[in-house]
Amino acid sequence: MKRLSFLDRYLTIWIFLAMALGIGLGFIFPSFVGGLNKLQVGTTSIPLAIGLVLMMYPPLAKVRYEEIGRVFKDIKVLILSLVQNWIIGPTLMFILAIIFLPDKPEYMIGLIMIGLARCIAMVIVWNDLSKGDTEYAAGLVAFNSIFQMLFFSVYAYIFVTVIPQWLGMEGAVVNITMAEVAKSVFIYLGVPFIAGMVTRYIFVKVKGKEWYEKVFIPKISPITLIALLFTIIVMFSLKGDVIVSLPLDVVRVAIPLLIYFVLMFFVSFFLGKKIGANYAVTTTLAFTAGSNNFELAIAVAVGVFGIHSGAAFAAVIGPLVEVPVMIALVKVALWFQRKYFGSHSM
């Protein structure tokens, strides 16, 4: 069985350490915070914007866009994946946000953003560890990357502004426009998306696919973690005013996230098995639906609502919960393989 890299395996610990470092910097060196506040254009923090774009670039440079045609070969599986990723996932997270955070509309938004952002990076890792279908996973990642580029802003507007109004949840309504979200999506997803596609096209053509995937990609992969931790340090250095309530708030946000990741995985796995997909495709569907693009959720939450917002804070909790849960679910998937698929699983 493949092993998770040292950096990825302890990602939750690195995030906690980054939070602590950010909080410490904010209290011990207030001049550090003052310096960060000066590096802004309007409401946009320049260091944070750079960190967020860099965080998104390696995952999008890894995407095998040429594999997207694979997802159209089995329409039944494609429809199931679309339903799981773009109907069940966002709706489930919306419901959980309402149930667990009715008095915290900004935290609700952070959760909703996580539910809307379909995974395009770590899902490849979980899929490999659980012996999923590598090429099909690559196709779904490519498909979801393009789908998010086109429709994320529409989804965000519907789930954050329109549906709460329909349900009469006036206290939870946050008025945003599709243009606001689209602007952040373009900056934090569009720019690295274009850069990733161009990078892949040029280097594969000049140096070859094997060099690109075995030499170039491993070299740029750590950028995502470094940029993520940098982003968290900056965010938490500016949040000294909420430190006292931080532990309780982390737990309140973490509980619905835990329920979401577990439910999405199990529901998606058994739906895949129900339609007759083999183990490799079934587990790929389950991890694609069950994991999320927390980098995009953080970026959009910061871009639209600001670095000090509850939405940005809630989005940061996403990877804290997701990583250890997904590591556990990899073991569950391999147990399901032995129990339900046997020797004919691949």
UniProtKB/Swiss-Prot annotation:
<feature type="transmembrane region" description="Helical">
    <location>
        <begin position="82"/>
        <end position="102"/>
    </location>
</feature>
<dbReference type="Pfam" id="PF01758">
    <property type="entry name" value="SBF"/>
</dbReference>
<feature type="transmembrane region" description="Helical">
    <location>
        <begin position="253"/>
        <end position="273"/>
    </location>
</feature>
<feature type="transmembrane region" description="Helical">
    <location>
        <begin position="41"/>
        <end position="61"/>
    </location>
</feature>
<keyword id="KW-0813">Transport</keyword>
<keyword id="KW-1003">Cell membrane</keyword>
<feature type="transmembrane region" description="Helical">
    <location>
        <begin position="184"/>
        <end position="204"/>
    </location>
</feature>
<comment type="similarity">
    <text>Belongs to the arsenical resistance-3 (ACR3) (TC 2.A.59) family.</text>
</comment>
<dbReference type="GO" id="GO:0015297">
    <property type="term" value="F:antiporter activity"/>
</dbReference>
<feature type="transmembrane region" description="Helical">
    <location>
        <begin position="216"/>
        <end position="236"/>
    </location>
</feature>
<feature type="transmembrane region" description="Helical">
    <location>
        <begin position="318"/>
        <end position="338"/>
    </location>
</feature>
<dbReference type="GO" id="GO:0015105">
    <property type="term" value="F:arsenite transmembrane transporter activity"/>
</dbReference>
<keyword id="KW-0059">Arsenical resistance</keyword>
<dbReference type="InterPro" id="IPR002657">
    <property type="entry name" value="BilAc:Na_symport/Acr3"/>
</dbReference>
<keyword id="KW-0812">Transmembrane</keyword>
<dbReference type="GO" id="GO:0015700">
    <property type="term" value="P:arsenite transport"/>
</dbReference>
<feature type="transmembrane region" description="Helical">
    <location>
        <begin position="13"/>
        <end position="33"/>
    </location>
</feature>
<protein>
    <recommendedName>
        <fullName>Arsenite resistance protein ArsB</fullName>
    </recommendedName>
</protein>
<feature type="transmembrane region" description="Helical">
    <location>
        <begin position="140"/>
        <end position="160"/>
    </location>
</feature>
<feature type="transmembrane region" description="Helical">
    <location>
        <begin position="285"/>
        <end position="307"/>
    </location>
</feature>
<dbReference type="GO" id="GO:0005886">
    <property type="term" value="C:plasma membrane"/>
</dbReference>
<comment type="function">
    <text>Seems to confer resistance to arsenite by allowing cells to extrude this compound. Could be part of an arsenite extrusion pump.</text>
</comment>
<dbReference type="GO" id="GO:0015104">
    <property type="term" value="F:antimonite transmembrane transporter activity"/>
</dbReference>
<dbReference type="InterPro" id="IPR038770">
    <property type="entry name" value="Na+/solute_symporter_sf"/>
</dbReference>
<dbReference type="InterPro" id="IPR004706">
    <property type="entry name" value="Arsenical-R_Acr3"/>
</dbReference>
<keyword id="KW-1133">Transmembrane helix</keyword>
<dbReference type="GO" id="GO:0046685">
    <property type="term" value="P:response to arsenic-containing substance"/>
</dbReference>
<keyword id="KW-0472">Membrane</keyword>
<dbReference type="GO" id="GO:0015699">
    <property type="term" value="P:antimonite transmembrane transport"/>
</dbReference>
<feature type="transmembrane region" description="Helical">
    <location>
        <begin position="106"/>
        <end position="126"/>
    </location>
</feature>
